[in-house]
Amino acid sequence: FIDVELILEDEAGLKIPNSSIVEKEFFIVPKDYVTKGGNSNNFGVMRETYTEDGTATVEFIETNIYNETDEEYYVDDMTLRIGDYIVKPESTEKYPVSKRGSLIGVYHMNKGYADFKQINILYQNEEYSIVKSNTQYGLSVYDYIVLDATTVNEDELIYE
């Protein structure tokens, strides 16, 4: 007998193996609290910290943005912790970091290390998925991805 699979839907996108797909947790923060700054003009947040004598100060923490909605950003959970307070730029308003969400994606390795990229799945079967290409925070044609997401950790150097 021969197994035959008929695909009746026509989806255009990037074909990736299901073994490369991973779900990752992020902090969700309001857009008003994210700013550009630091030495490299990258995105980040102003985190409230305390000096040894108990004085409150604010430090710029650079963070990657992995997705956005109309009012919020999904930011990396490596630099912030639950319970941290972030301060709105040019204001004294504070926001407690606690809201979390997850995104489906793959580990992108164009720069030599595993970097999470969100994907939008258009079609999926047991072996592979068709994902939307050229999205703002996602994959493009000719991007290198990790084939088995269970074998790497975020920001791990990848040796060919």
Annotate each language-model stretch with its function.
Residues 1-116, 120-160:
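Edge-of-domain interaction segments
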